[in-house]
Amino acid sequence: MKISKIFSIAAIALAAMSMVSCNNKKFHVTGEISNAKDSTLYFENMSLNGPVVMDSVKLDKDGSFAFDEKAPKAPEFYRLRIAGQIINVSIDSTEAVSIKAAYPTMASKYEVKGSENCSKIKELAILQLKLQANVNAIINSPNLGTDAVEANVGKVLEEYKNYVKRNYIFKEPMKASSYFALFQTVVLGNVQSLIFNPRNNKDDIKVYAAVATSWDTYFPKAERGLNLHNIAIEGMKDVRIIQAKQQQQQIDPSKVSVTGIIDIALNDNKGNVRRL
């Protein structure tokens, strides 16, 4: 057999092996959950359609666990769960994340290593728990009337949003932690509501649009990025409808002028201006 033909066959074989290797790339989530002997630990993908169980394990006395799954092409979200206790995990490509916690306080007290995004998500989760505690304290205060409760709750929510926008979302809109922040919730009167309201708050819609634009640049055609675009666009439509109704109540309808959609501009990773 000619040497050139041997080299050709070898090159094809290496290319095939490379393709298989790329398709088999995995991420790993390992660690320990103490005080949880005989409890079932679930590893779930937080898909756009809701939680999907990927794997589970019945914990021994030492609480050790190890999960691995196919690496996603864009940042994806998972969670470790025992009953109602949850630890949120973000995975970007072939990361190896290590988590240590104790049941039943794993949701608020855990250590995470190997992922900057997971560390920031932990920070956001703890901030969210503190926010909920503050809201509950205001609602349950015997010294506040209905109007005062509403005003104080609105104030702490606005302060929270401004802090998260400044220190997480607008700072790094392409990060998984920024996406995660958009979908944090708070319980108000037994109703779970999004902290950032994408339906009728034009300032919050701008936040969704900023992350959507950034994801479109860094993770083109990613399902989550496309979903953010849809949320932002629907929110813009709702705001225009509300504004139009308000204007009709205030002035002659013949004088109403409909403006265009909110214009969001961000520089992409190449320095080019991108708009939603």
Describe the function of each predicted region.
Residues 1-10:
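Bacterial N-terminal signal peptides that target proteins for export
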Residues 207-274:
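N-proximal helix/coil linker or "cap" segments that precede and/or mark the start of modular domains
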Residues 173-194:
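Amphipathic alpha-helical repeat scaffolds of TPR domains
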Residues 22-171:
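A non-transmembrane, solvent-exposed segment enriched in polar/low-complexity residues
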Residues 17-21:
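C-terminal motif of bacterial Sec signal peptides marking the signal peptidase cleavage site
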Residues 165-170, 182, 212-216:
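Amphipathic alpha-helical segments within well-ordered protein domains
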Residues 188-206:
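Short coil/linker segments at helix-helix boundaries
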